[in-house]
């Protein structure tokens, strides 16, 4: 099964990994942060601001791969501060209120100044 690298200017890029990969009917979105691609800086310093931007970035990568939020079957979330869990859920519920995908949340063990959240997704087009 051939794989297609997904790129978009509507989400931040890294020289170390692809924004996303499409393999057959699966679309994989790399860990995506709350960086605003137009400024190159974090979209804010609250968990709600960064979660909103990270989800916006993930959605842009999904679109570039031919998928949408309704196609997402799994989401992985890494938080730098466990106390942000409730704020994360507050913003997350605005995006996935009915028939949400599976999800896990874990603590991110890497300390990056300003980073509060990283989100990855898997979508299925079947």
Model-identified regions with their sequence ranges:
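N-terminal presequence-like segments and the immediate start of the first folded domain
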Residues: 1-56, 60-73, 79-126
């Amino acid at each position: 099964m051939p794989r297609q690298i997904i790129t978009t200017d509507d989400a931040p890029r890294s020289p170390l990994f692809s924004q996303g990969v499409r393999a057959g009917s699966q679309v994989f979105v790399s860990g995506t942060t709350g960086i605003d691609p137009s400024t190159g800086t974090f979209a804010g310093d609250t968990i709600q601001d960064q979660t909103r931007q990270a989800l916006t970035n993930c959605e842009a990568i999904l679109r570039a791969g031919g998928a949408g939020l309704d196609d997402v079957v799994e989401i992985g979330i890494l938080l730098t501060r466990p106390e942000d869990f409730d704020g994360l859920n507050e913003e997350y519920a605005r995006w996935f209120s009915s028939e949400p995908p599976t999800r896990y949340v874990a603590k991110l063990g890497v300390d990056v100044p300003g980073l509060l959240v990283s989100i990855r997704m898997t979508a299925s087009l079947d």
